[in-house]
Curated annotation (Swiss-Prot):
<comment type="function">
    <text>F(1)F(0) ATP synthase produces ATP from ADP in the presence of a proton or sodium gradient. F-type ATPases consist of two structural domains, F(1) containing the extramembraneous catalytic core and F(0) containing the membrane proton channel, linked together by a central stalk and a peripheral stalk. During catalysis, ATP synthesis in the catalytic domain of F(1) is coupled via a rotary mechanism of the central stalk subunits to proton translocation.</text>
</comment>
<dbReference type="Pfam" id="PF00137">
    <property type="entry name" value="ATP-synt_C"/>
</dbReference>
<dbReference type="GO" id="GO:0045259">
    <property type="term" value="C:proton-transporting ATP synthase complex"/>
</dbReference>
<feature type="transmembrane region" description="Helical">
    <location>
        <begin position="8"/>
        <end position="28"/>
    </location>
</feature>
<keyword id="KW-1133">Transmembrane helix</keyword>
<comment type="similarity">
    <text>Belongs to the ATPase C chain family.</text>
</comment>
<keyword id="KW-0406">Ion transport</keyword>
<keyword id="KW-1003">Cell membrane</keyword>
<comment type="subunit">
    <text>F-type ATPases have 2 components, F(1) - the catalytic core - and F(0) - the membrane proton channel. F(1) has five subunits: alpha(3), beta(3), gamma(1), delta(1), epsilon(1). F(0) has three main subunits: a(1), b(2) and c(10-14). The alpha and beta chains form an alternating ring which encloses part of the gamma chain. F(1) is attached to F(0) by a central stalk formed by the gamma and epsilon chains, while a peripheral stalk is formed by the delta and b chains.</text>
</comment>
<protein>
    <recommendedName>
        <fullName>ATP synthase subunit c</fullName>
    </recommendedName>
</protein>
<dbReference type="InterPro" id="IPR020537">
    <property type="entry name" value="ATP_synth_F0_csu_DDCD_BS"/>
</dbReference>
<feature type="site" description="Reversibly protonated during proton transport">
    <location>
        <position position="63"/>
    </location>
</feature>
<dbReference type="GO" id="GO:0008289">
    <property type="term" value="F:lipid binding"/>
</dbReference>
<keyword id="KW-0066">ATP synthesis</keyword>
<feature type="transmembrane region" description="Helical">
    <location>
        <begin position="66"/>
        <end position="86"/>
    </location>
</feature>
<dbReference type="GO" id="GO:0005886">
    <property type="term" value="C:plasma membrane"/>
</dbReference>
<keyword id="KW-0812">Transmembrane</keyword>
């Protein structure tokens, strides 16, 4: 029989793993943005500054989901508030 604490720890590990899958989406999105940015600079070299600025802003916004997922995963693994409720 599984006790409550073991069940919470197992569910937390699964949840942390699922949260880290969000990092895949952020990486794919940043890859597409960098590719399209390089393509745009190749087509319009005069607008390089504006294109790079917009691309970096978009990459920063896309990265926030990965950072939030990492924070949630670390909280679930190392500072789990649910264990104290048992």
């Amino acid at each position: 029989m599984i006790d409550g604490q073991s069940l919470v720890l197992a569910a937390s590990a699964i949840g942390a793993g699922l949260a880290m899958i969000a990092g895949i989406g952020a990486g794919i999105g940043q890859g597409f943005a960098a590719g399209k940015g390089a393509e745009s600079v190749g087509r319009q070299p005069d607008a390089q500054g504006d294109i790079i600025r917009t691309m970096l802003l978009g990459a920063a916004v896309a990265e926030t989901t990965g950072i939030y997922a990492l924070v949630i995963a670390l909280l679930l693994l190392f500072a789990n508030p649910l264990i104290g409720m048992l």
